[in-house]
């Protein structure tokens, strides 16, 4: 089982810019 990308590369959602 490969590690989730969320833990490997925590990037903000480009689809929904909260900022």
Curated annotation (Swiss-Prot):
Taxonomic placement: Eukaryota, Metazoa, Chordata, Craniata, Vertebrata
Glycan attachment positions: 15
Alphabetized UniProt keyword annotations: Glycoprotein, Secreted, Toxin
Compartments, as annotated in UniProt: Secreted
Tissue: Expressed by the venom duct.
Domain of life: Eukaryota
GO cellular component: extracellular region
Name of the protein in its database record: Pro-rich toxin 4
Listed GO MF terms: toxin activity
Organism of this sequence: Dendroaspis angusticeps (Eastern green mamba)
